[in-house]
């Protein structure tokens, strides 16, 4: 493989274009040019060409990975699955995840806390938050730590607000039953729901 021309890209800063003898183009970084000692007229052996192609692929995956993780926080498991869907080899996906963890961009413990806080603000209970952490691939050993930040008074306020919104002053047993069922689906336990119903003015028997 012979590099016929090596020139800077007009569209992407710090990107270089290597035009090969067959007319194909390699998009390179400055580091790759230095690492492989590339210049116009340079002939690469098959082994060098393979290593260069692999280096380009690796850097492209890493650049895309950085954009993905800074745009949308994800768990490590979610992130690895997403990379694999982009045809990134599983071993390479794990390597990139390790790299992002070292940089501090991928942190399952912090992500678990964010998810717990988000769903608490949305008015969901602990059971629902656990389901969400499971769905997002957060390791189970991180769940309790994330849920510790949820205060009982926060749950109570969220349930009270939900009942006020749904019932709007109604004490009709059918309306109350529907609201109670909805709270259960949101992940609240019966003791929490019954306490809220008492605060609302309903007689409740456990």
Protein language model annotation of sequence segments:
Residues 1-206:
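An alpha-helical, amphipathic repeat domain used for nucleic-acid recognition
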């Amino acid at each position: 493989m012979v590099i016929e021309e090596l020139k800077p890209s007009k569209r992407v800063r710090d990107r270089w274009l290597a035009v090969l003898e067959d007319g194909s183009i390699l998009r390179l970084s400055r580091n790759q040019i230095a690492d492989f000692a590339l210049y116009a007229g340079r002939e690469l052996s098959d082994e060098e060409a393979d290593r260069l192609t692999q280096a380009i692929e690796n850097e492209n995956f890493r650049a895309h990975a950085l954009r993905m993780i800074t745009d949308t926080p994800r768990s490590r498991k979610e992130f690895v699955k997403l990379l694999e869907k982009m045809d990134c080899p599983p071993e390479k996906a794990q390597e990139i995840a390790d790299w992002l963890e070292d940089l501090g961009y991928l942190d399952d413990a912090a992500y678990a806390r964010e998810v717990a806080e988000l769903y608490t603000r949305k008015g969901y209970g602990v059971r629902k938050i656990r389901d969400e952490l499971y769905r997002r691939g957060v390791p189970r050993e991180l769940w309790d730590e994330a849920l510790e930040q949820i205060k009982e008074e926060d749950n109570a306020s969220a349930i009270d607000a939900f009942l006020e919104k749904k019932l709007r002053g109604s004490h009709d047993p059918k309306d109350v039953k529907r609201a109670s069922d909805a709270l259960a689906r949101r992940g609240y336990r019966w003791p929490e729901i019954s306490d809220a119903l008492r605060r609302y003015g309903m007689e409740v028997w456990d």
